[in-house]
Amino acid sequence: VPSTPIYVTSFHRRHFTERCIREIHERTAPGTYEIHLYDNDSMANREDREFACSLLEDGLITSLHLDSRNTGCLYDKGVFHMMTTVDTPYYVVTDNDVFPPMLKPDWLSQMIAIMDRHSSIGLLAMQLPPQWLQEPFYGFDDDVVYCRAVGNTYKMVRRAAFPIESFEPKLMGFGDDAIVSVEMSKRGMQVCFCRNVWCYHAGQCTNWGYRPEEVSLDPRKVSYGEPFVYEFEDKAKYLPTMQWRLNRE
């Protein structure tokens, strides 16, 4: 079975990139994935570039793309199709400030199994606390939570429904949360969260994990205020304590 490509987009916070790569390896079944790192012009200094190159040299990632631009959350990741070495039914997109849970079976095999069972799902991501477009729809008893849009929280994409090669310039100037999800919906596919696969996100950290001198580099984070929080049943697994996403009145 070909390895599923996991595309990690990084922007500063090297400690998060280190943790993200490490925990993917620690929490994903060996031989089932390959990691591709795409950096948004945040590794200009020699130490950071050497760190990124060492990940490649040590075999921790399959490919490395150091972009000379900061594309932010704009979805111009058409470069991904140049990075992958396999052709699989699904691929995964995430950011360096999102960390996977430790589950049995592992998170990747669970998400693939969900996609295999639900041929109508085009985008499937790990759960986060409710946020804007990611607010779920209620009333469905299923292993997924249907919603308006999902972000890059280990977002699994059905390649046949939205192949990487189909990214057009008009799609590359918009945030991925809304536009890619809407485009997938227009193609008749569902957009969902996993019901029982949650992740840890830097939004749960003060200033999203940025050092004081880095906050101003990402204007989206300057006015975010206090980090969002939710309770964990088991911090190692990042599972919810209750089904409030579906049962909230």
Model-derived features: where do they sit?
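Acidic donor-binding segment of Leloir-type glycosyltransferases
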Residues: H25-S68
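Short, well-formed alpha-helical segments that are part of the catalytic scaffolds
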Residues: R13-E26
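A short, glycine-/small-residue-rich helix N-cap motif at loop->alpha-helix starts
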Residues: S68-K77, M172-F174
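Cell-envelope/extracellular polymer assembly enzymes that use nucleotide-activated donors
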Residues: S3-P5, I179
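Active-site nucleotide-sugar/metal-binding loop of Leloir-type enzymes
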Residues: K77-Y90
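Short beta-strand-to-loop acidic/aromatic patch adjacent to the donor-nucleotide binding site
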Residues: T88-P101
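Conserved catalytic core of nucleotide-sugar-dependent glycosyltransferases
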Residues: G72-L74, F99-P169
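C-terminal catalytic/acceptor-binding lobe
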Residues: D143-V144, A149-G151, E165-E249
